[in-house]
């Protein structure tokens, strides 16, 4: 008799998926206002920018932001890698509102107000640490063809303080409510102690902590902070360029992305109840996934190259899509499918923006 009864719970699960609670997904990072424009090669050369890169602004980039606004047709979008991912995840989750939480630091200014408004519009539960020493951070997205060169002027984003925000009980309770955590590697340049506090909490409570390699410079110049948090990472994201730099910095002695994924998966881990999963996207090429004992290649959705408007935010969107299914304990293949879907939507639009409702089934 029991055998006949077995499928019932499964069926029930499909008809009535467990309702998600608010704040089930937690993200923390650098909230930035993206200033994006299609530029020319001369502009990239003038500021010695690579066509497809992410860097932090230096003194030589001081004029870049003004020149971008004066010389090209710019668009303003609420950005910042982790914040983008939270918005995309919330968009795919739809209900409840505020399933995704976001922490970061902004200035008390016009750009800060825009970020607050945009987060509210996206139904993300954003709790910003607001300070008046630095203005809200900006990120110049210099687009040429299918490439985007990002120059981030962190400003206020760099002022996030663990003891002034994360440690406050009213904020920490939101961390405790989450089941899945996501922090872009970028935030390791700002507050590694905040990243570690959240990572440790996740490991101690057997919840899922996820991290992104974010940019080649993180693996190069913030290696210590990155490797301090790596033992807590249950799911590691990155793209092919970041994977290659990470492998070189770690002495993996291979350029094969599947091998790199395997070696990253095998790095020491604190919570032995969860084996690490490593996911490397490669633009239009297959997404490489090291999970359990296999490395699998997942093809991305066929995309008409003419339809691609702006690849900025594609990686963030992939993560957001992935996390939107992970919070409901969907299988890995579904998480990847949602990631690919989200990225395919975002690259057809400027900035990390999306239509009102998703079309993902």
Curated annotation (Swiss-Prot):
Enumerate the cofactors the protein uses: Mg(2+)
InterPro entries documented for this protein: Adenokinase, Carboh/pur_kinase_PfkB_CS, PfkB_dom, Ribokinase-like
Chain span(s) of sequence motif Nuclear localization signal: 7-15
Q: Which GO terms describe its molecular function?
A: adenosine kinase activity; ATP binding; deoxyadenosine kinase activity; metal ion binding
The annotated active site, in chain numbering, is 316, 316 (proton acceptor)
Residues noted as binding Mg(2+) 2 in the record, renumbered to the chain = 147
Q: Which SUPFAM superfamilies match?
A: Ribokinase-like
Q: In which pathway does it act?
A: Purine metabolism; AMP biosynthesis via salvage pathway; AMP from adenosine: step 1/1
How would you summarize its activity regulation? Answer: Activity is inhibited by 5-iodotubercidin and 5'-amino-5'-deoxyadenosine.
Q: What is this protein called?
A: Adenosine kinase
In which organism is this protein found? Mus musculus (Mouse)
